Amino acid sequence: MSLLDYFRSNKKASSASLAKERLQIIVAHQRTERGAPDYFPQMKQEIIEVIRKYVYISEEQVSVQLEQNDDNLSVLELNVTLPER
């Protein structure tokens, strides 16, 4: 029985760590959106539409983040994973 318990405990630990990692990603994403201006979701969608005029991408391939520094400086970071040619 101890051999079976050994394999079962590994699956629980890996699924728990995977769930923790996913939750951290979701929380980080929500934190970045919390301080974003009201126009931010629409701007993100329009950026995706412009890119789609040239290359098909899904929304998961685009990451848009707005970072604000203490010096009243805002930085818009855009990461796009383009498909292979």
Curated annotation (Swiss-Prot):
Keyword DNA-binding appears in the UniProt entry: no
Q: What keywords are assigned to this protein?
A: Cell cycle, Cell division
Keyword Repeat appears in the UniProt entry: no
Give the residue spans that cross the bilayer. Answer: none
Per the record, the domain of life is Bacteria
| Gene Ontology biological process terms in this record | cell division; regulation of division septum assembly
Protein purpose: Prevents the cell division inhibition by proteins MinC and MinD at internal division sites while permitting inhibition at polar sites. This ensures cell division at the proper site by restricting the formation of a division septum at the midpoint of the long axis of the cell.
Which family does this protein fall into?
A: Belongs to the MinE family.
Name the chain's protein. Answer: Cell division topological specificity factor
